[in-house]
């Protein structure tokens, strides 16, 4: 009997081993692309989001690119059975594959932080990490998340981190539309600008004026045109000469800097696109975009063909709260009204 049991055990072990050997290897699912774009140049696909990572593929200039996800400086793409990463600014004409998706590049901030006393944004969530910029008292920042005592902020074309200590006076959550009551924040975004450089004093004035002009209530069904409300961008309306993005470079013009206000507003509204906000018209600054935001998320204004237009399709009014205090930060929020 014992010999028979040993034989059965050996047979079972052999069967399990054969099954394991014959079982097909677990297949890795190919990520589903959400957006398509066009390569503006020859692009190397990297295994990781790093210029030093292994090359795993290639796009020729003009090739169709399928985008899975994005980081401030990188895009995750899929080409055939290859999944990898490319530098974000090497593509253009990014559009959703599913028309119900939000525009390319949208991010949803989760909190708004009021700065009670001067604090520092760092390049990593660590007290010893490099300081990127000092945020003065009285500013508001939109936070992507809060983890382990650090708030994560979209900063130019990268991430920055804010220590959530006593220098942060208060934190307010950004609520889902279905939970929001009058006075609650539906969406918020902040962008940053330099305080030194050519014609910067005029740019500070223009950004502040642009914010002041667009602070208003938008009623249900109302169409909002940035040019109609904040323009014309001349001295009669208080605007100064400052540097503007033009044809891939910069040039001085009246109202330079107002595009940062319209672009920040666009990023506020993108998460709500098709969910209460209809983005009617938007144009970028061209293939290079605007460097104060991740590539592909700017909204140029100024000329007849350059305007940012949206419509409030909620069944309640919304209020645009836009601020800039000449201290390097543009903060804009959309608030539910009665």
For the regions a language model picked out, list residue spans one by one.
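Sec-dependent N-terminal signal peptides of Gram-positive bacterial secreted proteins and lipoproteins
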Residues: 4-25
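Short alpha-helix capping/helix-loop boundary micro-motifs
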Residues: 49-54, 125-130, 210-211
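SH3-family beta-barrel domains
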Residues: 25-44, 57-61, 68-71, 92-120, ...
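A structural signal for short, hydrophobic beta-strand segments that form beta-sheets
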Residues: 39, 66-69, 142-143, 279, ...
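Core beta-strand residues in small-molecule sensory/regulatory alpha/beta domains
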Residues: 46-48, 121-126, 335-338
